[in-house]
From Swiss-Prot:
Single GO cellular component term: cytoplasm
Originating species: Chloroflexus aurantiacus (strain ATCC 29366 / DSM 635 / J-10-fl)
Record Pfam families: YbeY
The protein, known as: Endoribonuclease YbeY
Record-level Gene Ontology MF annotations: metalloendopeptidase activity; RNA endonuclease activity; zinc ion binding
Alphabetic keyword roster: Cytoplasm, Endonuclease, Hydrolase, Metal-binding, Nuclease, Ribosome biogenesis, rRNA processing, Zinc
Cofactor list: Zn(2+)
Entry superkingdom: Bacteria
Length: 154
């Protein structure tokens, strides 16, 4: 499947953008999303995730990943049915990637891929904050996709 995944690395961040693209595409393929879906992913800093978390969720604290799904209900724009489907944007804190990789005892690459998978699943409607059953469903799907990527839990 062919998807459009735009990865933006903020200044000074040396994350593996190809891994991010691969991880996002793996989720979209595993979830059988139609070709042409679009996702934007920004790898940024703790400070920026803190600001976004505060401004958009009302939580005055840094976090590792945020997803901003496009619900498709913006009536200002009309999109032809044959146009690509824009799913939304994800922001990932690279500082959290490094810290959590060390904390959990795995590679920064695995953590970066995991947060990407987690964020894309949120764009597709998965939400671990909706209770234990949904959290378990999301975690299972994350691990299935991480295995597909060759980055299973160590």
């Amino acid at each position: 499947m062919i998807y459009t995944i735009e990865v933006q690395l903020d200044e000074g961040i040396t994350a593996d953008s190809e891994l991010v693209e691969r991880a996002a595409a793996a989720v979209l393929a595993a979830e059988q999303m139609p070709e042409g879906c679009e996702v934007g992913i920004r790898i940024t800093t703790d400070d920026e995730l803190h600001r976004l978390n505060r401004d958009f969720r009302g939580v005055d604290a840094p976090t590792d990943v945020l997803s901003f799904a496009d619900d498709g209900h913006d009536s200002r724009f009309v999109v032809a049915p044959d146009q690509p489907r824009y799913l939304g944007d994800i922001a990932i804190s690279y500082q959290r990637v490094l810290a959590q990789a060390a904390e959990y005892g795995h590679s920064p690459a695995r953590e970066l891929a995991y947060l990407t998978v987690h964020g894309v699943l949120h764009l597709l409607g998965y939400d671990h904050e909706q209770g234990p059953a949904e959290a378990a469903r999301m975690r299972t799907r994350e691990e299935e996709i991480m295995t597909i990527l060759g980055l299973p839990r160590e």
